[in-house]
């Protein structure tokens, strides 16, 4: 098969200064949680994308000086010549597949807490941007930069440019985005200088012009110089000579760098989850740039399909299709389009688990692509898997994300697999959760795996089949794995946060009951002590059904873990927009027929609140009765010829969908090893002691 004519435009080469990208697929800089501490992990992950057809592969943010220290978050570093070596493996891995390697320079300015280096932050005017999340807070106000500091900043960029060229990078970024130092020079709120670097936009952009010009002089024909810039706030600032300060900026500086990479000033707005944005949501912020420059323009926008990608090119919005999340979910997306295999694309679901990994300081993970982050330490590959080691057969019980991933990966290895599920449709929890507001993209977890399984002739599917232990013993499979999910339980929590069971009544429900269409009263109270999305989603869903909704949580906000996935503020806004009453820092301690008694988490003050129906969201229990029954009868397992029995996914340890998919993939990769899969057989990266 060959590329669909509609998508040929995506494979045009693009000249970027002295370099040429072989197509328009551009992996923009994105954090991957490895930094300089895990050079092999970084190289393998970026190299896989180059193998998959991306023409440009960039690092995440790379600090150029100790005054831009972002610990404890895992940033890349190019402070001195000793840092060069850690970048070379990535550059080599990218070049091996005829792709360009880019590096994104980062100076955080007032944002950089410098917790490790203990240097004072620096900024144009000594103004610290106030934030609401603890991880971004620090106690040191920035120093006001003098002319010497500005000269030093430029020199740090030039020194880093020379080091990047030594490492072999093809594209070098000057980063004027988010709340970082070059951006603060552009921003009238954070730059109130009275010298030639402040005042008019022409003056405020002077530093950028000097950085770009001098970096280009150092790079020569060895590397292109790109600029990554946030436009949303500049678009809101009035200009005396143009439509906005953003327009004026590009009119002044549009031809200076070799490429423009457009982003927003706030990461959570640029990379919202699929609950809160549609593909192409960035067009209001990047669609004007091409009219003001002849240089190539790249931008993101949660592009997951070749149709919207090609439309961005054909409609003159972008020159190159920028991607972070789609390149994580399917590193081979470009090659699949080139080969006419669009139906085989593993589409990003927009869950932002990848973003959450950076915010937690760990290597990036992906719900759709369980090999992400495991390329080096486990040797996993998104499109290849080791062949079977025997002719044994495998029975997978449960058709949710864990069971589907196990089935697909086992079948790709060459095993004969049967998957049985008690429902009439494969999907498990995905079928329920994808019906909630904004969650339809989660169906891609099921759709991808079912479509791939249907192309294989070594998988048998048995739906509407509830197997009991005797059935399993009689079926004659060599290996059995249960992936039977978990169920929400009717429970509240005690003062130690342990779940306390609550008797079910005709007015007390769980999400399981809501999914089944239980009869709710006009007023519904939700007690949510789950960290993640279910409580807020239940509130939205029930509100959309026409009920009045109150949500009570013991935490400071609803769905607090969702800060990690860049969703917590959007969740808060959505609840406010839907007029859902939120009571935080309270837990239910008693339930009466028409009221609940709540206890304030700080003051211990108790209050009675009237209620209608009550939905309890917080504790899930493994559906492991089948597994336990089989496991308890080892003699019967032996007599029936079952060599191994495993329990995976939510039926083993309830978690997010990403954990279930990973569990299925891990099982398929390791079930025929001599060692138990609980023995973590992966490589570690060790520091060199000097």
Set out the residue ranges of the language-model regions:
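Flanking helices and flexible, charged tails adjoining ferredoxin-like Fe-S electron-transfer domains
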Residues: 212, 377-389, 412, 416, ...
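Rossmann-like dinucleotide/flavin-binding elements
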Residues: 388-419, 462-473, 484-499, 505-563, ...
């Amino acid at each position: 098969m060959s590329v669909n004519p509609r998508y040929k435009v995506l494979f045009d080469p693009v000249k970027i200064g002295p370099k040429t990208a072989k197509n328009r697929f551009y992996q923009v800089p994105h954090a991957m949680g490895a930094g300089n501490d895990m050079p092999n992990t970084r190289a393998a992950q970026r190299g896989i994308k180059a193998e998959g057809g991306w023409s440009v592969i960039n690092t995440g943010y790379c600090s150029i000086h100790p005054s831009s220290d972002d610990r404890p978050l895992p940033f890349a570093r190019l402070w001195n010549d000793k840092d060069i070596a850690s970048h070379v493996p990535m550059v080599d891995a990218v070049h091996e597949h005829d792709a360009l390697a880019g590096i994104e320079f980062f100076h955080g300015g007032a944002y950089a807490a410098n917790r490790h280096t203990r240097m004072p932050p620096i900024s144009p005017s000594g103004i610290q941007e106030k934030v609401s999340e603890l991880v971004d807070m620090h106690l040191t106000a920035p120093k006001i930069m003098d002319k010497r500091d500005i000269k030093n900043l430029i020199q740090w960029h030039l020194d880093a440019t020379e080091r990047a060229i030594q490492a072999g990078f093809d594209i070098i970024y000057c980063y004027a985005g988010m709340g970082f130092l070059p951006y603060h020079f552009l921003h009238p709120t954070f730059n109130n200088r009275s010298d030639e670097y402040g005042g008019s936009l022409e003056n405020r952009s002077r530093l950028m012009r000097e950085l770009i010009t001098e970096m280009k002089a150092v790079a020569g024909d060895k590397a292109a110089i790109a600029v990554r810039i946030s436009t949303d706030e500049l678009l809101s600032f009035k200009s005396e000579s143009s439509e906005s300060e953003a327009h004026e900026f590009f009119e002044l500086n549009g031809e200076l760098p070799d490429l423009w990479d457009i982003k927003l000033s706030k990461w959570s707005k640029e990379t919202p989850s699929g609950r809160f944005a549609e593909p192409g949501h960035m067009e209001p912020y990047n669609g004007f740039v091409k009219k003001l420059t002849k240089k190539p323009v790249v931008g993101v926008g949660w592009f997951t399909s070749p149709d919207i990608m090609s439309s961005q090119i054909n409609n003159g919005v972008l020159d190159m299709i920028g991607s972070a999340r789609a390149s994580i979910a399917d590193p081979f997306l470009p090659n699949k389009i080139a080969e006419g295999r669009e139906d085989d694309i593993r589409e990003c679901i927009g869950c932002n688990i990848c973003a959450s990994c950076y915010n937690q300081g760990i290597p990036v993970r992906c719900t759709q692509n369980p090999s992400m982050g495991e390329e080096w330490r486990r040797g996993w590959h998104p499109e290849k898997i080791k062949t079977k080691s025997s002719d044994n057969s495998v029975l997978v019980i449960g058709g949710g994300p864990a069971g589907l991933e196990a089935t697909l990966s086992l079948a790709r290895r060459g095993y004969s697999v049967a998957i049985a599920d008690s429902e009439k449709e494969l999907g498990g929890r995905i079928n329920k959760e994808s019906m909630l507001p904004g969650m339809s993209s989660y169906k891609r977890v099921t759709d991808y795996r079912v479509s791939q399984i249907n192309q294989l002739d070594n998988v048998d599917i048995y739906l509407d089949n509830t197997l009991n232990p005797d059935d399993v013993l009689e079926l004659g499979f060599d290996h059995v794995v249960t992936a039977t999910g978990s169920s929400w339980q009717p429970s509240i929590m005690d003062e130690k946060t342990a779940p306390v069971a609550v008797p079910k009544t005709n007015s007390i429900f769980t999400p399981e009951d809501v999914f089944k269409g239980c009869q709710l009263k006009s007023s519904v109270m939700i007690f949510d002590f789950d960290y993640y999305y279910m409580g807020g989603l239940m509130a939205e869903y029930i509100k959309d059904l026409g009920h009045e909704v109150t949500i009570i949580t013991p935490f400071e906000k609803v769905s607090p873990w969702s800060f990690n996935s860049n969703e917590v503020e959007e969740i808060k806004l959505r609840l406010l927009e839907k007029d859902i009453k939120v009571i935080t820092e309270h837990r239910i301690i008693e339930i009466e027929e028409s009221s609940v008694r709540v206890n304030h988490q700080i003051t211990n003050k108790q209050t009675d609140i009237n209620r209608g129906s009550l939905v309890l969201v917080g504790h899930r229990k493994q559906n492991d009765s089948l597994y336990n029954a089989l496991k308890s009868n080892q003699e019967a397992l032996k007599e029936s010829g079952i060599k191994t029995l495993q329990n995976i996914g939510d039926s083993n340890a309830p978690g997010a969908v990403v954990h279930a998919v990973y569990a299925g993939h891990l099982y398929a990769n390791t079930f025929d090893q001599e060692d138990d899969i609980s023995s973590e057989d992966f490589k570690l990266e060790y520091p060199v002691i000097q």
